[in-house]
Amino acid sequence: MTHDLTADRARLAELIRQLAVVHGKVTLSSGKEADYYIDLRRITLHHEAAPLVGRVMLGLLDEAGIEFEAAGGLTMGADPVGTAVMHAAGDRGIDAFVVRKTQKVHGLARQVEGPGVDGRKVVILEDTSTTGGSALTAVEGVRNAGGDIQAVAVIVDRDTGAAEHVAEQAGVPYLYAFSKNDLGLD
């Protein structure tokens, strides 16, 4: 089945505005305060929006010419984004993975769970980013596991320095599907 990426982007933006944007004072995971919160779990776990997330993120990566074999990021925000991309990729053989904040000390003592990333081209995904901290934690974990990071891609960029931090500290392209301005947030 072929999908219209422009229509998918428009519908996903509409769903984000309707379901995920919560106005009011909040403290973000970065410790910064904001006048709104974008709860993208309301999108990435939503029956209609999740497939759109997968197609839009895959389209974003394809348009940028990013080749990869696996996609994932820091648990928990990135978990459903990775599986959405995996499903959208269909028969392309893209795996999903999750990255723990710290390496386990029991079991297999892994920080990266799922199909192995060692020697594979991977993309780090995130739902939203303020400073890039979660993405950078995932980058470090995946690199320690032997993954070859091709890019960091987020659904919504808050335009508060994440792109610069990722470029400077990880040295990989930083892509986003929507800016806060795309969603009418200032």
Where are these regions (language model features)?
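Short glycine-rich phosphate-binding loop at a beta-alpha junction
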Residues: 66-75, 153-154
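Phosphate/pyrophosphate-binding loops at sites that engage ATP/ADP/AMP, CoA/4′-phosphopantetheine
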Residues: 57-68, 139-145
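Solvent-exposed alpha-helices and their adjacent loops that cap or buttress functional pockets
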Residues: 30, 90, 114-118, 141-146, ...
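PRPP-dependent phosphoribosyltransferase catalytic core
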Residues: 2-15, 140-186
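Short, glycine/charge-rich flexible loops or terminal/linker lids adjacent to PRPP-binding catalytic cores
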Residues: 82-123, 131-136
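Active-site-facing substrate-recognition patch
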Residues: 1-64
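Conserved acidic residues
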Residues: 69, 120, 150
